[in-house]
């Protein structure tokens, strides 16, 4: 596929072309886009996209590493109140279509991960063993 090959078609169909070099602004991979009939489906598909993106960026990553990444992302979304969770599609929390500033960025994820590491390191070795045993 050549660069710009589909630009004219996307524009003709009312779409928007984003240059991935960042010249049109920053692409936030943590922004949750509508990708299904309801917010739960969009959230699940978004997490799947993040999982695939991680594996693309680090193909040698073990499944445990990818799972820890997703768990950290979900904890971050919890902080930002971006988890739909309601089983009733009519009462789900809106997590898509929000202003860009409503979504965390990777710097926020890094901050959270550093907090999690500090918390683990501050525990005594027996407490750390308990944490590790319950996670496995």
Task: Report each predicted region and the residues it spans.
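P-loop NTPase motor domains
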Residues: 7-15, 20-22, 29-136
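Conserved Walker A/P-loop ATP-binding site and its immediately adjacent core
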Residues: 1-6
């Amino acid at each position: 596929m050549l660069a710009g090959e589909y630009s004219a078609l996307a524009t003709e169909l009312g779409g928007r072309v984003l240059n991935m070099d960042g010249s049109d602004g920053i692409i936030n991979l943590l922004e949750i886009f509508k990708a299904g009939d309801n917010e739960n489906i969009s959230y699940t598909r978004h997490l799947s996209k993040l999982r695939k993106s991680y594996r693309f960026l680090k193909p040698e990553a073990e499944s445990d590493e990818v799972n820890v990444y997703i768990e950290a992302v979900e904890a971050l979304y919890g902080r930002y109140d971006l988890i739909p969770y309601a089983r009733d599609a009519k009462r789900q929390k809106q997590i898509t279509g929000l202003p860009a500033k409503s979504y965390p960025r990777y710097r926020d994820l890094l901050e959270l991960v550093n907090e999690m590491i500090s918390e683990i390191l501050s525990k005594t070795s027996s407490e750390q063993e308990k944490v590790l045993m319950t996670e496995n």
